[in-house]
């Protein structure tokens, strides 16, 4: 009898793990619908205006640092996401992707639309987003993983 209870417990754990793994890595079906903070080497500086192409047409990553005409982006620090509706698929917006510059200052890139409209975003089930320890609000998430596409969001 004890063998059956242990066997049942083991099977339940395996099934729960398999279900959790499937939802943990639930990425969007269309790769065009996701965006992530660009790599430092993909960011161009033109007289203090920092830009990087986005995956989706009609949007780009943009940031400005006054007096940083010759500085280079050297390191990604973190991305900050503000939840506006956590009940619906963790909707909100990226407040910024924060980078270190060669002169010791910081750069914050935002996702800007060519037509000026704001995009509804979601962190979905991307595992790199966690509640920020730098802010006193569960509505502010951060991602500081360094690998490509770690800090992804879904554009809706």
Regions of interest found by a model, annotated:
Residues 20-156:
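Mitochondrial intermembrane space
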Residues 6-16:
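Bacterial N-terminal signal peptides
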């Amino acid at each position: 009898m004890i063998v059956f209870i242990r066997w049942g417990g083991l099977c339940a754990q395996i099934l729960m793990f398999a279900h959790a793994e499937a939802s943990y890595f639930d990425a969007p079906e269309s790769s065009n619908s996701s965006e992530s903070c660009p790599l430092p080497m993909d960011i161009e500086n033109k007289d203090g205006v920092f830009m990087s192409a986005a995956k989706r047409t009609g949007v780009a990553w943009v940031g400005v640092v006054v007096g940083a005409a010759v500085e280079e982006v050297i390191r990604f620090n973190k991305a900050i996401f503000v939840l506006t509706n956590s009940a619906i698929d963790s909707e909100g917006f990226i407040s910024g992707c924060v980078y270190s510059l060669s002169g010791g200052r910081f750069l914050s890139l935002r996702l800007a639309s060519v037509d000026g409209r704001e995009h509804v975003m979601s962190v979905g089930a991307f595992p790199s987003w966690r509640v920020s320890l730098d802010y006193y609000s569960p509505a502010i998430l951060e991602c500081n993983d360094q690998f490509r596409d770690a800090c992804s969001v879904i554009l809706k």
